[in-house]
Structure formats: C-alpha cells, structure tokens
Amino acid sequence: MCGIVGYTGVQGASPILLEGLKKLEYRGYDSAGIALLNEGQISIAKVTGRIANLCEKTNDGKDYPGTTGIGHTRWATHGAPSDTNAHPHVSNDGRFAIVHNGIIENFMALHDELTAKGYHFESETDTEVIVHLIEMYYKGDIKKAVIKTSARLQGSYALGVICADEPDKLFVAREASPLILGVGVGENFFASDVTALVSYTRNAIYLEDGEFAEITPEEIKVFDCTGQTVNKKITRIVWDIQAAEKGGYEHFMLKEIMEQPHAFKATIQPRINDNDIVLDDSDLSKEYLESVNKIVITACGSAYYAGCAAKYTIEKLCKVPVITELASELRYSDPLIDEHTLLIVLSQSGETADTIAAMKECKSRGAKTIAIVNVVGSTIAKLADHALYTWAGPEIAVATTKGYTTQLAVLYLFGLYTARKLSRISEEEYSKLLSSLKALPKKIQETIDMNAKIHKIAIKYYDNKSMFFIGRNTDYAIALEGALKMKEISYIHAESYAAGELKHGTIALIEEHRPVVALCYNEALMEKTMSNIVEVKARGADVLAVTYKGNMKIVSVANDVIYVPKVDTLFSAAVEIVPLQMLAYYVAKLNECDIDKPKNLAKSVTVE
C-alpha cells in the first residue's frame, strides 16, 4: 500500500526521489517524506497530504542536497496520518534512516524491549522499531546489522536504509513485500514498483523473499541471510514510459476506460493462433484437466468480482464446478482443497497480501495454481505454477477499469481452452464463441462511444446519497463491480443485490426517487428481472436499465435505458461493465471527487 524509492549516483537525489514518489501515487497514501545523505549528515523532510506539499516544502528538492537518498509514501496502518508518523524514520543517534512498506506483526514486543533498553520512540508506527534495532545491532558493519534486524522481524517488509557512515550506499531487504532494483550506469535505484523506475532505467532486478542488497552508484550486490552472494538475473522492463501519463485526459481513470478495447485486444490476440488458443507456456494437458474436480477462483476487490462474472462462463463451458472465494476469507477457512483442485488467482498488481496468503495455503494442500496478473515478475506470478499476464499496461487510477476487463479476457480464454480440451463443446460451438471473443474489443469501443449519453444520465443521478445495483446470474456479478465503482470514487453509498433477493428485506430501503441500476442482459432471465424492476418502481424508485440493443420491452418499466452491443451472454460482462465505469466516473466528477486517488483507498494492497 505504501511506496518506497531510493537513489544513489552522481545526480541530485531529491528530484529523482520526488518524481519516483509521484509515479507511486496510484498505490494510495496519506503522507510522504524523503531522507538525503549529504556530507555525513542525514536530512529529513516529511509532510502529511500530497506529494505536492513535499515538493513545496523541499523547494522541489533544491533545499535538500545529496546524491544518495530514500523516499516513501505512507498509507496509515499503525498510527494516524501525521508528519511524525510519516517515513523516513531516524535512529536515536541520527546515524540511520529507513523507509518501510509492510507490517511488522511483533512490533509491540520489540517496542517494549527497545524501550526497556533506553531507546526513545518519536512515532506510533511499527516501522520505528526497525531503525532502532539496526542502531542496536550496528557495530561498524551495516550489512550485518540489517541482517540481524531482519531476523527479529515477523511480518512483511520491503526496507530501504541509509547510513551516515556509508555516504554512497543504500541497503535494502525484502520479505513478503515487493522490491525491485533499477540498474543504471553510474547510478542505481530501488522501488516498490517499476513505474518509479522506467523514466531512468529499463533494467531491473527483482528481489526474492529473504534477500538483501547493497547498492552503490557502480554496482549492486545481492546476498542472503547468511551474507552469501546471490547471483541475480537482470530483467528488461517493457512498459512504455508514456503509458503511465494521462495523454491529454483529465483523469487517469478516464484514460484507462478509453484504453480498454486496446488492452483487451492486446491480451487475447497473441494467444489466438488461427483457431487455437495458446495459454502461454502452461502445460494444462487434457489428462490433468480431466483430473480436476473443482476450480476455485480467489481474489480481492474488483479482481474477485471479475472472477464472479467469469465463474458462470467457465462453469457453463467446462461443466466443472467453479467456486469463487474472497482471498481474505479463503485463507482462514480450512478449505477443502487438494491435488484435484485447480486454483485461479487474480491480482492486477500481483502483490495483494491476502491473495498471496490464500494462494500459499492452497498450494500447501496440493492445488495447482494459475495466476492472472498484470505485473511481470510480481510475487503472485512467481509463486504460481503458471502465470497468464493481462497485457493492460500500467494502471494508475486506484479504481481499476482495464485491469478488470483484461482479467475477464484471460478467464474467457481459459474457459474456451479448457472446454475444448475436455471436449465439453463441439468444434462448431468453439469456433463460434472464439469469433465472438475476438469481436469484443470492437463491441467495447462501441460502448465507450456512448459516453456523451452516459454523462447526461449521470447529471440526473449524481446528487443522490444512496444507490442500488441489481441483476441475476452474471448480471448480479456485474452489479457487484458496478456498485463498487460507484462507492469507491464518488463516495455515494452503493450496494448490489441479487434481484431475486430484493423481496427478502432489501426492498424495505426503496423509497421515492431512489436510483436503482438494473442489469438486464440475460434473455433467459429477462422476465424475472423485469418483474423485480416493476417491484421497485411501484415503491418510487428511479430505474436505470442496462441491456442489449434491440430489447424494447425494458422501455416500459425503466426510467432510463443504456443499450450496449449484443454479444454472446457468456461474454456480456466485458461490455456491460463499461457504462457502469463511465457512470461512476461522471458522477464522481460532478461531485468534484478526487477520482484517481479516492480517500482511504490504495491501489496495491500489500498488507493484510
């Protein structure tokens, strides 16, 4: 959830650190800070609020000289947002400064131990115990002090450390939190995400859990907990630098909504060879797939809702039970999972803490794992037996859009691939569905082209305090994501319900002019959903229906209708979700919300 950066080289470090922190804003934060090494002294600047405040305080870094430094964006976990609780934190003797992403689970015991030994704490954070431990263990060898400190920590951490006695060095450590080293010429970097590095280098080293590194302008040395050297491969970063910029759009979210046709196509096209689907280097043989008696999809947030939508598609195509589980619940549920379970894990960042923990639990029980992630080299990608990447490019807005639709794209490919392997559908049906899948980017674009109409509808609904989203089957899964989009960026209370459950309590909340967004795409369930619309209309609700072009029945029961292109119902989520994304965007804009960085939210949830 936090973001960390570090630099050592010949340039002034402050502007590079500030720029790197800006690139990490999408992860979510409430405060920020930098620490610079200069002439044997450590200088610190910390602020509550936006990085713009930090730039102002430091005069864009000019008032904080030095060619080695570290930076941090904080999302509060221990201690309220404040300048004092912001990172970097400094040792009592002023010799060390650190930045930390993660949570130290045993920090209270360490805090009590260090307090008893005379160490003074300035903040309420778990992180401060780390810098005092380093000071305690330091006997002239910072490398040994960091290793000894790490051995005392329980939980997750990506650490960046500077020492006044080592003026041109950075020290880093990783455990269950992402950390990437940027390899330059006469300068080197570290960051919690490649987006902070690509403006300066395309060469990266991905640290693994339990690894440490000593970084100077000339070289990077990676070692393990025994101090032994670890040989690491340099990976080329392929993301386009400009892809992380707004490109003329007012917000990243709008830009990313508009990019969905391209992202969807970029995700499916390389995996379709003539009439065959090629799932990268996965070895999902017919023999193995026949042994699978259950597919479990696990994720958090929007990724989970993508799994819920695709569940119906995969189950119908493959004739195999598909269960969707929230990762934060699955990991604690003593799941009935074994070697006959195929686990599909979804995460845009590939670093979602609860998802990683659930994945490890299921792997320990024998499940084979497929990871659907957007970040190459991420923790989840490396943990999985097979990684299938969503080629969405960097997604900066906290509220996911193209990340969600490209996850659907991979899940659709998986469903078709598996159904064909298991001979659960005919070749004729397979070819027809594959053609429908290949047509989806165009259909998504047609939906985006209705943005002017959706903006007009948003004007009608933006000043409400509460909204409901309803649907059946896949439409209900889409309602879940639609409600999430509305609440997370517009701060309007929005809840989703299975349409058939309204009469079991929820209908008591319907009152005059309460907006109800009804997803009505599934023809087989149309009459049932329309009857639910009539029920809420009778109680005064204003109904906005989302349905396929040509469905004229809906006009008689809805106040407003958004028509999206007609596609196979198995793939309808990819087009139905787009107007809901745009509706949430325009409602948030009309309410003057911080669309790209909603309050209290983080893009990449790397703590539990």
What would you call each of these model-derived segments?
Residues 67, 71-84, 273-287, 310-346, ...:
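Glycine-rich oxoanion-binding loops at beta->alpha junctions
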Residues 542, 557, 567-608:
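Generic C-terminus detector
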